[in-house]
């Protein structure tokens, strides 16, 4: 009984299809289907024969020519690979309704479809895929391109299961007739799924290039019926089966709208010298959808201010571009687009992807309104989208004013006074210091300094907030009066020294050198231990002058930067390396420069934290980063743990990455006199001097205890070994994977190589980074 019902259903669909074709203009939607036959290990998507007797077989994988044996009178003329699929071309001497092939060892009788379809001859055609968009969206899409570009027909690959095709076709038919559209649709379904086998449904945010946190986002289960299109051979099938005699074909998707300002895209292609026009698309987004509503074209009023992504498509006039070897998603092979400017199109992302929460599709901090999209929503779609909230007014930038450093500390007692003195001399007025779990007197010294007006000290509330110490501190800092009233803000650690190399070395000199800037990236210069193994109670900046070269692309930490920024309201909160939460409506007010005063690209405005060959600069300011200091002090640092990446050990691999002794930089010594004057003032206070001495004594005592511990003694021996000293001068010769895996992967003969030589060493990648 089930077979009878299935057969009757199939016959009804066939009759429905025939009646539509024979019914002429009364019907606007024709249904068609790709056979998608499986033969052995191969899948034959379609077989098409044209009026010259050329037969095309379209396989959804790489197929060797010898795997397909044609019948007598049918001769293979070419076997072409296209995007992982195969097109075989045969000449048929005596056309027949059925042809017997042997494919992958199995006999198969083919009844090829005649193509291209005559009802599309000399028509302006849209070529698109539908993957979940509802009929209302497709109707709006058809109406737009019919009205503004003169579209007469559309061939739409419907990615839904075949059983869903009739109801969708009926909805389209009813909508076209209701709207009075003079446009005809060929709706193509397939007997087999055509998506990527290992991807979720395309609606899943995982399939959106801009989706934030994709490295943490768990993709939905594979859904080969609704996944992004994997059978990209479809475009060549569409050409041979339907469109090779069309006047012009525009290849977009049903959530794309082609810019109408330059006239009809079809006319442009038809008069183009090459017969092809390049289409270049951007992604557009809603700001938010009204509760309980489905997304529409008119909801999409936002673009990303910093996006550089371009979607490539095309419009071709087949009669003029006869030299084309094949059609693909993003190009027509062997046809150059016209030299005039490409035509733009907008891809409306919430129509194909789940738009219930726009923040899952795109970082909302990147979205700004596009006035043209707002106008189009009202004028063309008569829609009232939810607009972006009005931006807060920016505070004026002050050339000087109060500059504040926010930092976190744990057992840093011996190094506090020099760091404080240096930055006071540079021009920082306020210091907000959070401490936690100190055992060396750091917290006592900080509390004393607060009582005497040098800084503001707070206990780190990381336990109550259930955050990492540094993140808890920065989140709490937003509510502190000294932060709220600050004109300039910087998050820096006690092993980081702002080294201003212009003018008199003060913040005023830096601001004078780049008067329009309101954000400064200060790139790290990693300073090593200069082969100094023992702790000495003396300024760090006078002891350690060996460092990484200015051009140091590896390890990736080497070119990290910290950010000094004007507290104007451009950003919402502090961050470890740079402020976070850019107010995107104000992105054009951001004047971000590097350490040489050169403008930074907008691509870093939201989340960039490290320099590159195009953006590094040290001429005006750099951040001296003394991450290791002496080997003895590093023992204490390792035991203490980290305030940000608390789950990562500061072991031999960390020392290897951060201990850089290949170059020398003494530029900060020009500022020693200013630092020393403030340090003397601090040490002239007996209570401060006593608290500092206590911290130094505890630091030395802890070093003695750790060196007596067998594990730490062995670690110290490794740190101070001739091998590790040699490696600290060879970083420029190593590939990135060496730093990820640690010094143990470097053979002894490589460690003994000449630092000045022109050699290179790397290792294969691994999944786990060594710390």
Over which residues does each language-model region extend?
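Low-complexity, Pro/Ser/Thr- and charge-rich linker/hinge segments at domain boundaries
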Residues: 113-131
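Cell-envelope/extracellular polymer assembly enzymes that use nucleotide-activated donors
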Residues: 125, 403-404
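Active-site beta-to-alpha loop of glycosyltransferases that engages the nucleotide-sugar donor
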Residues: 128-143, 158-163, 407-418, 437
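Active-site-proximal specificity loops/subdomain of glycosyltransferases
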Residues: 162-247, 441-488, 500
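Short acidic/polar active-site loop segments enriched in Thr and Asp
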Residues: 151-152, 275, 429-430, 487, ...
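Catalytic-site signature of metal-activated, phosphate-bearing donor transferases
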Residues: 2-50, 54-113, 204-220, 224-228, ...
């Amino acid at each position: 009984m089930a077979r009878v019902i299935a057969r009757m259903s199939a016959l009804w669909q066939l009759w429905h299809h025939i009646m539509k074709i024979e019914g002429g203009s009364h019907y606007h939607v024709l249904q068609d289907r790709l056979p998608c036959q499986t033969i052995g290990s191969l899948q034959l998507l379609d077989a098409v024969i044209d009026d010259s007797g050329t037969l095309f077989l379209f396989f959804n994988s790489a197929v060797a020519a010898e795997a397909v044996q044609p019948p007598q009178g049918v001769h293979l003329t070419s076997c072409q690979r296209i995007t992982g699929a195969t097109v075989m071309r045969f000449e048929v001497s005596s056309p027949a309704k059925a042809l017997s092939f042997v494919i992958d060892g199995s006999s198969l009788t083919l009844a090829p479809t005649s193509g291209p379809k005559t009802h599309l001859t000399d028509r302006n055609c849209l070529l698109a895929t539908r993957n979940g968009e509802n009929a209302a969206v497709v109707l709006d899409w058809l109406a737009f391109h019919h009205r503004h570009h003169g579209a007469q027909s559309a061939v739409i690959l419907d990615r839904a299961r075949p059983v869903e095709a009739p109801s969708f076709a009926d909805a389209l038919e009813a909508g076209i007739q209701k709207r009075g559209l003079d446009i005809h649709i060929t709706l193509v379904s397939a007997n087999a799924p055509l998506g990527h086998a290992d991807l979720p449904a395309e609606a899943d945010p995982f399939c959106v290039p801009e989706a934030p946190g994709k490295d943490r986002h768990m993709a939905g289960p594979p859904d080969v019926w609704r996944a992004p299109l994997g059978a990209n051979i479809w475009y060549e099938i569409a050409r041979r089966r339907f469109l090779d005699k069309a006047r012009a074909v525009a290849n977009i998707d049903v959530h794309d709208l082609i810019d109408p300002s330059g006239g009809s895209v079809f006319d442009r292609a038809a008069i183009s010298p090459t017969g092809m026009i390049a289409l270049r698309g951007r992604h557009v987004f809603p700001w938010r959808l009204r509760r309980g509503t489905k997304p529409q074209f008119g909801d999409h009023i936002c673009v990303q201010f910093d996006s550089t992504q371009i979607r490539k498509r095309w419009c071709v006039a087949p009669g003029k571009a006869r030299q084309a070897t094949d059609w693909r998603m993003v190009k027509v092979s062997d046809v150059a687009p016209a030299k005039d400017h490409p035509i733009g199109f907008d891809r409306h992302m919430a129509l194909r992807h789940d738009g219930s929460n726009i923040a899952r599709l795109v970082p909302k901090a990147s979205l700004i309104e596009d006035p043209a999209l707002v106008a189009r929503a009202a004028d063309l779609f008569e829609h009232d989208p939810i607009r972006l909230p009005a931006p807060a007014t920016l505070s004026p930038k002050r050339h000087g004013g109060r500059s504040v450093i926010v930092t976190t500390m744990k057992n840093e007692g011996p190094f506090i006074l020099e760091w404080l003195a240096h930055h006071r001399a540079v021009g920082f007025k306020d210091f907000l210091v959070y401490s936690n779990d100190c055992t060396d007197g750091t917290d006592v010294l900080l509390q004393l300094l607060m009582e005497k007006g040098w800084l503001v000290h707070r206990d780190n509330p990381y336990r109550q907030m259930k955050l990492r110490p540094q993140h808890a501190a920065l989140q709490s800092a937003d509510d502190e009066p000294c932060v709220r009233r600050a004109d300039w803000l910087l998050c820096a650690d006690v092993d980081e020294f702002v080294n201003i190399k212009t003018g008199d070395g003060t913040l005023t000199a830096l601001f004078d050198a780049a008067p329009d800037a309101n954000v400064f990236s200060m790139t790290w210069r990693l300073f090593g231990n200069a082969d100094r193994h023992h702790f000495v109670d003396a300024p760090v900046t006078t002891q350690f002058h060996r460092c990484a070269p200015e051009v140091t692309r590896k390890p990736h930490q080497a070119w990290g930067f910290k950010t000094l920024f004007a507290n104007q309201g451009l950003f919402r909160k502090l961050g470890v390396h740079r402020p976070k939460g850019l107010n995107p409506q104000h992105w054009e007010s951001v004047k971000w420069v590097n350490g040489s005063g050169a403008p930074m690209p907008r691509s870093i405005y939201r989340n960039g934290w490290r320099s590159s060959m195009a953006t590094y600069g040290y001429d005006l300011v750099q951040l001296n980063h003394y991450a290791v200091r002496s080997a003895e002090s590093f023992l204490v640092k390792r035991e203490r743990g980290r305030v940000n990446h608390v789950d990562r050990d500061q072991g031999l691999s960390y020392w290897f990455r951060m201990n850089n002794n290949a170059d020398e930089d003494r530029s900060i010594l020009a500022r020693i006199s200013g630092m020393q004057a403030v340090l003397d003032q601090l040490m002239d206070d007996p209570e401060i001097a006593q608290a500092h001495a206590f911290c130094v004594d505890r630091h030395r005592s802890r070093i003695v205890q750790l060196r007596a511990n067998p594990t730490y003694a062995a670690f110290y021996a490794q740190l101070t070994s001739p091998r590790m000293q040699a490696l600290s001068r060879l970083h420029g010769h190593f590939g990135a994977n060496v730093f990820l895996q640690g010094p143990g992967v470097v053979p002894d003969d490589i460690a003994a190589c000449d630092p000045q030589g022109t050699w290179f060493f790397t290792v294969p990648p691994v999944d786990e980074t060594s710390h």
